[in-house]
Structure formats: structure tokens, C-alpha cells
Amino acid sequence: MKKKFLFMIPLCLFIIDYFLIKYQVIQSIDWFIYHLVQNLKCDFMTSFFKLCSTLGSTWFYVILVLTLVILKNKKDIWVGIHLLIIQGMNRIIKALVKRPRPPQIYHLVKETNYSFPSGHSMSAMIGYGLLVLEVQKSSLKYKKVIEIFLIGLSRIYLGVHYFSDVIGGFLLSLSYLLFIYYNTSLYT
């Protein structure tokens, strides 16, 4: 398969994830994983996952984008633009799908909008995913992949997303990431 079409694989998986949610096929898996992660709660883990969540937050990326604009590195500015595009896509999809978040009784952070797909997961995949593709040092690549995973996991731990929300966010952003990486002149 040509690399320029690789984006279709995670896109198709995202669509499948959406339909599994819509028709409540994945609901029991979502609740199983949700409660499994919820049972890990302790003060240290809560502090740790709040930090992880902050590294995937909109405010973190706003500050990052402004810093990149000030530094005027053209390639870095594009990372910021991609993050903004992903956040826009996320808001539109959430407004269309309107999946409620898990019950507020489990929330360790305040969230008011809809659940699917996870915006933190989408931003992490783009922001850190571009680094994974660009960086030559393999140890840094592994660290960034772990950060992406931890940001997604943090959203389940903090009680504001289901597993399928996080997976959906990862898949949609991975699709976008592969599309821009293999189909634009910025990265080829």
C-alpha cells in the first residue's frame, strides 16, 4: 500500500468506533475499562494523571502555538496550525455526535462539553505524533509515544472519558497525522 493512503486505515477504524458507540456495541467494554482504571485511584496517581492531562489541554497548546509563532520557525508554526485544525474538528464532531460524558460523580476535573472523541487524545496524537515522525533519536520517539498513551489514559482515570472516546480521538488524529505527513510538501 502506498504511504499516501495509510491515513485511510485509522480513518476507517474511527468510523467503526463511532458506529460501535452509536449502536452501544462497545458499551460493556467501555464500562469495564472505565471501572478498571477508576479502581487505581490514589493521591499520587491523581496528581500524576492531572499533570498528564494538562500536557494535552487546550491551554497548553495555546501557549505552545503562541511560543512557536514568536520563534517564527515555519515548520513549528505548522504544528500549531495542525493543532488548531484538530481542535476545530473535535468541537464539530462532539457537537454532531453529542455523546454524554461518564457520570459526574466520577469526574476528578471539570468538563462541560461532550465526550466523543477525546480532544486531549486528538491533540496529543498531533502534537507529539509529529515529533515521533520527525525525531531521529529512537529513545525520544518512545518517550513521546508513552506521553501520548498517558494523556489518553489520564482522561479515563480522571473520569471524563470512556475508552472508546480516547481510542476515537487517537484514530482520527492519527489519520490526519498520516495524511499531512505523507501528502503535503511540509513533511515529504
Which residues does each PLM region occupy?
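Membrane-embedded catalytic cores of phosphoryl/pyrophosphoryl-handling enzymes
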Residues: 107-188
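Aromatic-anchored segments of alpha-helical transmembrane domains
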Residues: 13-18, 85-92, 146-160
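Hydrophobic transmembrane alpha-helices of multi-pass, membrane-embedded glycosylation machinery
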Residues: 64-71, 149, 170-171
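N-terminal transmembrane-helix/juxtamembrane module of multi-pass inner/ER membrane proteins
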Residues: 1-60, 94-108
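Membrane helix-loop-helix hairpins that form the core translocation module of multi-pass transporters
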Residues: 47, 85-92, 167, 173
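Alpha-helical transmembrane segments of integral membrane proteins
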Residues: 5-9, 49, 74-82, 140-146, ...
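Membrane-interface loops
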Residues: 59, 69-138
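Membrane-helix interfacial "entry" motifs
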Residues: 39-50, 71, 75, 109, ...
